[in-house]
Amino acid sequence: RQRQMCIRDSLKLSDCGTYNMMIGAADMGTGCDTILAQMAAEVLDCEPDDIIVFGADTDASPYDSGSYASSTTYITGMATQNAALELRENIKKIGAQLLGCAASEVDFDGKEVYIINPDGADNGAVSVSLSDIATKAQVNNTIPVDVTATYSSPVSPPPYMVGMVEIELDKETGAVKILDYQAVVDCGIPVNPNLARVQTEGGIGQGIGMALYENVTYNAGGKIAENDFMQYKIPTRQDVGHINVEFETSYEPSGPFGVKSIGEIVINTPAPALAHAIYRATGVWHRTVPFTPEKILMGMADPNWHEKDLRVK
Protein backbone atom coordinates (compact mmCIF):
# COMPACT_ATOMS: atom_id res chain seq x y z
CA ARG A 1 0.00 0.00 0.00
CA GLN A 2 1.36 3.40 -0.96
CA ARG A 3 2.31 5.63 1.96
CA GLN A 4 0.90 9.13 1.69
CA MET A 5 2.65 12.10 3.25
CA CYS A 6 0.70 14.02 5.88
CA ILE A 7 1.48 17.69 6.40
CA ARG A 8 0.09 20.26 8.85
CA ASP A 9 0.47 24.02 8.81
CA SER A 10 -0.62 26.51 11.49
CA LEU A 11 -1.45 30.20 11.03
CA LYS A 12 -2.34 32.72 13.72
CA LEU A 13 -3.46 36.34 13.66
CA SER A 14 -1.38 38.09 16.32
CA ASP A 15 -2.72 40.86 18.53
CA CYS A 16 -0.81 43.48 16.52
CA GLY A 17 -2.47 42.57 13.23
CA THR A 18 0.36 40.54 11.69
CA TYR A 19 0.49 36.77 11.22
CA ASN A 20 2.53 33.94 12.72
CA MET A 21 3.03 30.80 10.65
CA MET A 22 4.27 27.58 12.25
CA ILE A 23 5.58 24.92 9.89
CA GLY A 24 7.33 21.59 10.31
CA ALA A 25 9.13 21.77 6.97
CA ALA A 26 12.89 22.23 7.24
CA ASP A 27 14.40 24.80 4.90
CA MET A 28 17.38 22.87 3.50
CA GLY A 29 18.12 25.44 0.82
CA THR A 30 14.76 25.20 -0.94
CA GLY A 31 13.58 28.57 0.37
CA CYS A 32 10.40 27.00 1.74
CA ASP A 33 10.07 29.61 4.51
CA THR A 34 9.85 32.34 1.87
CA ILE A 35 7.66 30.39 -0.55
CA LEU A 36 5.11 29.30 2.06
CA ALA A 37 4.94 32.86 3.42
CA GLN A 38 4.27 34.08 -0.13
CA MET A 39 1.42 31.59 -0.51
CA ALA A 40 -0.18 32.61 2.77
CA ALA A 41 0.25 36.29 1.91
CA GLU A 42 -1.48 35.77 -1.43
CA VAL A 43 -4.56 34.34 0.30
CA LEU A 44 -4.57 36.92 3.10
CA ASP A 45 -3.92 39.89 0.78
CA CYS A 46 -0.91 41.05 2.74
CA GLU A 47 2.83 41.39 2.21
CA PRO A 48 5.08 38.38 2.90
CA ASP A 49 6.86 40.57 5.45
CA ASP A 50 3.63 40.60 7.48
CA ILE A 51 4.00 36.85 8.06
CA ILE A 52 6.52 35.72 10.65
CA VAL A 53 7.62 32.15 9.92
CA PHE A 54 8.61 29.83 12.75
CA GLY A 55 10.56 26.98 11.20
CA ALA A 56 10.85 23.35 12.17
CA ASP A 57 10.90 22.79 15.93
CA THR A 58 10.02 19.27 17.05
CA ASP A 59 8.70 20.62 20.37
CA ALA A 60 6.34 23.18 18.87
CA SER A 61 5.86 22.74 15.13
CA PRO A 62 2.83 21.00 13.64
CA TYR A 63 3.48 17.53 12.23
CA ASP A 64 5.32 17.28 8.93
CA SER A 65 6.32 14.00 7.27
CA GLY A 66 9.60 15.57 6.18
CA SER A 67 11.20 17.83 3.60
CA TYR A 68 11.87 15.12 1.05
CA ALA A 69 10.38 13.53 -2.07
CA SER A 70 9.75 16.90 -3.72
CA SER A 71 6.88 17.51 -1.32
CA THR A 72 7.36 20.89 0.33
CA THR A 73 5.96 23.33 -2.21
CA TYR A 74 3.33 20.96 -3.59
CA ILE A 75 1.97 19.34 -0.39
CA THR A 76 2.98 21.69 2.43
CA GLY A 77 1.94 24.55 0.16
CA MET A 78 -1.58 23.13 -0.04
CA ALA A 79 -1.77 22.88 3.76
CA THR A 80 -0.62 26.50 3.94
CA GLN A 81 -3.22 27.60 1.42
CA ASN A 82 -6.01 25.78 3.27
CA ALA A 83 -4.97 27.24 6.63
CA ALA A 84 -4.87 30.74 5.16
CA LEU A 85 -8.30 30.32 3.58
CA GLU A 86 -9.80 29.18 6.89
CA LEU A 87 -8.17 32.04 8.78
CA ARG A 88 -9.41 34.52 6.19
CA GLU A 89 -12.99 33.31 6.67
CA ASN A 90 -12.68 33.59 10.46
CA ILE A 91 -11.38 37.14 10.14
CA LYS A 92 -14.43 37.98 8.03
CA LYS A 93 -16.74 36.45 10.65
CA ILE A 94 -15.26 38.55 13.46
CA GLY A 95 -15.39 41.63 11.27
CA ALA A 96 -19.03 40.96 10.46
CA GLN A 97 -19.82 40.73 14.18
CA LEU A 98 -18.23 44.12 14.76
CA LEU A 99 -20.17 45.58 11.84
CA GLY A 100 -23.43 43.97 12.94
CA CYS A 101 -24.09 42.05 9.75
CA ALA A 102 -23.80 38.54 8.31
CA ALA A 103 -20.42 37.17 7.22
CA SER A 104 -21.83 36.73 3.71
CA GLU A 105 -22.26 40.50 3.48
CA VAL A 106 -18.59 41.38 4.01
CA ASP A 107 -15.25 40.89 2.31
CA PHE A 108 -11.62 41.24 3.38
CA ASP A 109 -8.96 43.15 1.45
CA GLY A 110 -6.02 42.42 3.73
CA LYS A 111 -6.30 45.65 5.71
CA GLU A 112 -9.96 45.78 6.69
CA VAL A 113 -13.24 43.89 6.56
CA TYR A 114 -15.85 45.94 4.73
CA ILE A 115 -19.53 45.63 3.91
CA ILE A 116 -20.12 44.76 0.29
CA ASN A 117 -22.35 47.38 -1.30
CA PRO A 118 -24.58 45.62 -3.86
CA ASP A 119 -25.38 48.96 -5.51
CA GLY A 120 -21.78 49.54 -6.51
CA ALA A 121 -21.19 52.43 -4.10
CA ASP A 122 -17.97 52.95 -2.13
CA ASN A 123 -17.11 49.60 -0.59
CA GLY A 124 -15.01 51.19 2.14
CA ALA A 125 -17.83 53.29 3.60
CA VAL A 126 -18.53 50.80 6.40
CA SER A 127 -15.50 48.81 7.53
CA VAL A 128 -13.39 47.64 10.46
CA SER A 129 -9.60 47.46 10.43
CA LEU A 130 -7.56 44.30 10.84
CA SER A 131 -5.94 45.69 13.99
CA ASP A 132 -9.39 46.18 15.54
CA ILE A 133 -10.31 42.63 14.57
CA ALA A 134 -7.07 41.37 16.15
CA THR A 135 -7.97 43.19 19.37
CA LYS A 136 -11.52 41.84 19.32
CA ALA A 137 -10.16 38.31 18.83
CA GLN A 138 -8.50 38.51 22.25
CA VAL A 139 -11.61 39.50 24.25
CA ASN A 140 -15.09 37.96 24.43
CA ASN A 141 -14.60 35.99 21.22
CA THR A 142 -15.33 32.37 20.31
CA ILE A 143 -14.10 32.42 16.70
CA PRO A 144 -10.53 31.08 16.49
CA VAL A 145 -7.84 33.19 14.85
CA ASP A 146 -5.27 30.41 15.09
CA VAL A 147 -5.98 27.57 12.67
CA THR A 148 -4.22 24.38 11.65
CA ALA A 149 -4.82 22.70 8.32
CA THR A 150 -3.83 19.15 7.39
CA TYR A 151 -3.21 17.95 3.86
CA SER A 152 -2.30 14.63 2.29
CA SER A 153 -2.18 13.81 -1.39
CA PRO A 154 -2.33 10.40 -3.10
CA VAL A 155 -0.73 11.87 -6.23
CA SER A 156 2.21 14.08 -7.09
CA PRO A 157 2.10 15.25 -10.71
CA PRO A 158 5.58 14.94 -12.19
CA PRO A 159 7.56 17.98 -13.28
CA TYR A 160 9.46 17.87 -16.57
CA MET A 161 12.90 19.04 -17.54
CA VAL A 162 15.16 19.15 -20.57
CA GLY A 163 18.92 19.35 -20.07
CA MET A 164 21.47 20.04 -22.83
CA VAL A 165 25.21 20.17 -22.29
CA GLU A 166 28.19 21.26 -24.37
CA ILE A 167 31.51 19.72 -23.36
CA GLU A 168 35.15 19.71 -24.32
CA LEU A 169 36.73 16.24 -24.11
CA ASP A 170 40.47 15.62 -24.14
CA LYS A 171 41.02 12.32 -25.93
CA GLU A 172 44.56 12.08 -24.57
CA THR A 173 43.47 12.12 -20.93
CA GLY A 174 39.73 11.41 -21.00
CA ALA A 175 39.07 14.61 -19.05
CA VAL A 176 35.69 16.27 -19.58
CA LYS A 177 35.24 20.02 -19.28
CA ILE A 178 31.70 21.41 -19.21
CA LEU A 179 31.37 24.56 -21.28
CA ASP A 180 27.65 25.25 -21.23
CA TYR A 181 24.54 23.70 -19.67
CA GLN A 182 21.07 24.72 -20.80
CA ALA A 183 18.01 23.68 -18.79
CA VAL A 184 14.29 24.14 -19.37
CA VAL A 185 11.99 23.20 -16.48
CA ASP A 186 8.23 22.74 -16.22
CA CYS A 187 7.43 22.91 -12.50
CA GLY A 188 3.96 24.35 -12.95
CA ILE A 189 3.76 28.01 -11.93
CA PRO A 190 6.99 29.06 -10.16
CA VAL A 191 5.92 30.78 -6.94
CA ASN A 192 9.32 32.42 -6.59
CA PRO A 193 11.24 32.23 -9.89
CA ASN A 194 14.51 33.37 -8.31
CA LEU A 195 14.46 30.61 -5.70
CA ALA A 196 13.33 28.06 -8.30
CA ARG A 197 16.21 29.10 -10.56
CA VAL A 198 18.92 28.80 -7.91
CA GLN A 199 17.50 25.47 -6.74
CA THR A 200 17.66 24.25 -10.33
CA GLU A 201 21.24 25.44 -10.67
CA GLY A 202 22.17 23.70 -7.41
CA GLY A 203 20.49 20.48 -8.51
CA ILE A 204 22.32 20.58 -11.83
CA GLY A 205 25.57 20.95 -9.90
CA GLN A 206 24.66 17.88 -7.83
CA GLY A 207 23.82 15.96 -11.00
CA ILE A 208 27.14 16.91 -12.57
CA GLY A 209 28.92 15.71 -9.44
CA MET A 210 27.08 12.39 -9.61
CA ALA A 211 27.85 12.02 -13.32
CA LEU A 212 31.54 12.95 -13.40
CA TYR A 213 33.09 12.93 -9.93
CA GLU A 214 31.39 11.35 -6.95
CA ASN A 215 32.13 7.71 -6.23
CA VAL A 216 32.58 5.41 -3.24
CA THR A 217 34.89 2.41 -3.47
CA TYR A 218 36.01 -0.24 -0.98
CA ASN A 219 39.04 -2.49 -0.81
CA ALA A 220 38.87 -6.23 -0.20
CA GLY A 221 38.77 -5.65 3.54
CA GLY A 222 35.77 -3.36 3.28
CA LYS A 223 37.68 -0.15 3.97
CA ILE A 224 36.31 2.89 2.20
CA ALA A 225 38.82 4.71 0.03
CA GLU A 226 37.04 8.08 -0.23
CA ASN A 227 36.91 8.88 3.48
CA ASP A 228 37.44 12.65 3.21
CA PHE A 229 36.99 15.43 0.67
CA MET A 230 40.56 15.08 -0.57
CA GLN A 231 39.53 11.73 -2.07
CA TYR A 232 35.77 12.17 -2.49
CA LYS A 233 35.62 14.60 -5.38
CA ILE A 234 32.77 17.06 -5.79
CA PRO A 235 32.51 19.80 -8.42
CA THR A 236 33.23 23.42 -7.58
CA ARG A 237 31.69 26.42 -9.30
CA GLN A 238 34.54 26.36 -11.82
CA ASP A 239 33.71 22.77 -12.82
CA VAL A 240 30.06 23.18 -13.84
CA GLY A 241 30.52 25.70 -16.65
CA HIS A 242 27.90 28.26 -17.60
CA ILE A 243 24.41 27.24 -16.47
CA ASN A 244 21.31 28.83 -17.97
CA VAL A 245 17.84 28.00 -16.64
CA GLU A 246 14.51 28.81 -18.28
CA PHE A 247 10.98 27.94 -17.17
CA GLU A 248 8.15 26.65 -19.33
CA THR A 249 5.12 27.33 -17.15
CA SER A 250 2.00 25.22 -16.94
CA TYR A 251 -0.89 25.27 -14.48
CA GLU A 252 -1.29 22.21 -12.25
CA PRO A 253 -4.87 22.25 -10.92
CA SER A 254 -4.14 19.89 -8.02
CA GLY A 255 -1.34 22.06 -6.62
CA PRO A 256 -1.50 25.32 -4.67
CA PHE A 257 -1.50 28.22 -7.14
CA GLY A 258 -0.75 25.80 -9.97
CA VAL A 259 2.61 24.57 -8.69
CA LYS A 260 4.38 21.25 -9.12
CA SER A 261 7.52 19.95 -7.44
CA ILE A 262 11.06 20.79 -8.53
CA GLY A 263 13.43 19.30 -5.94
CA GLU A 264 14.58 16.08 -7.60
CA ILE A 265 13.92 16.43 -11.31
CA VAL A 266 16.75 18.95 -11.60
CA ILE A 267 19.34 16.38 -10.46
CA ASN A 268 18.31 13.82 -13.08
CA THR A 269 19.21 15.37 -16.43
CA PRO A 270 23.00 15.96 -16.20
CA ALA A 271 23.99 12.26 -16.21
CA PRO A 272 22.14 11.26 -19.42
CA ALA A 273 23.02 14.57 -21.10
CA LEU A 274 26.70 14.08 -20.32
CA ALA A 275 26.58 10.41 -21.37
CA HIS A 276 25.18 11.51 -24.73
CA ALA A 277 27.78 14.25 -25.13
CA ILE A 278 30.60 11.81 -24.33
CA TYR A 279 29.15 9.37 -26.86
CA ARG A 280 29.07 12.13 -29.49
CA ALA A 281 32.73 12.88 -28.75
CA THR A 282 34.06 9.31 -28.51
CA GLY A 283 31.49 7.00 -30.08
CA VAL A 284 31.26 5.01 -26.83
CA TRP A 285 28.26 4.86 -24.52
CA HIS A 286 28.87 4.92 -20.77
CA ARG A 287 26.01 3.71 -18.62
CA THR A 288 27.50 3.63 -15.12
CA VAL A 289 28.29 6.80 -13.21
CA PRO A 290 30.67 8.42 -12.57
CA PHE A 291 32.08 8.88 -16.08
CA THR A 292 35.68 9.21 -14.94
CA PRO A 293 38.60 9.94 -17.29
CA GLU A 294 39.84 6.37 -16.68
CA LYS A 295 36.57 4.88 -17.89
CA ILE A 296 36.45 7.18 -20.90
CA LEU A 297 40.01 6.25 -21.92
CA MET A 298 39.33 2.53 -21.48
CA GLY A 299 36.18 2.88 -23.56
CA MET A 300 38.04 4.57 -26.40
CA ALA A 301 40.76 1.90 -26.28
CA ASP A 302 38.24 -0.96 -26.30
CA PRO A 303 34.74 -0.11 -27.60
CA ASN A 304 33.52 -3.49 -26.34
CA TRP A 305 34.60 -2.65 -22.81
CA HIS A 306 31.34 -2.48 -20.94
CA GLU A 307 31.96 -0.51 -17.79
CA LYS A 308 34.37 -2.79 -15.92
CA ASP A 309 34.44 -1.67 -12.29
CA LEU A 310 37.56 0.23 -11.32
CA ARG A 311 37.69 -0.95 -7.72
CA VAL A 312 40.48 -0.38 -5.25
CA LYS A 313 42.35 -3.65 -4.78
Question: For the regions a protein language model found, what residue spans apply to each?
Answer:
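Extended lipid/amphipathic-ligand handling interfaces
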Residues: 11-12
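Short, small-residue-biased leader/transition segments that mark boundaries at the very start
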Residues: 2-7
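C-terminal catalytic domains of large/alpha subunits in multi-subunit enzymes
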Residues: 1, 39-313
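Gly/Ser-rich, acidic/histidine-flanked active-site/gating loops
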Residues: 26
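Short, aliphatic-rich beta-strand segments
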Residues: 18-23, 178-180
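Thiamine diphosphate
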Residues: 32-39
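Residue-level signal for tight coil/turn positions that link beta-strands
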Residues: 15-16, 110
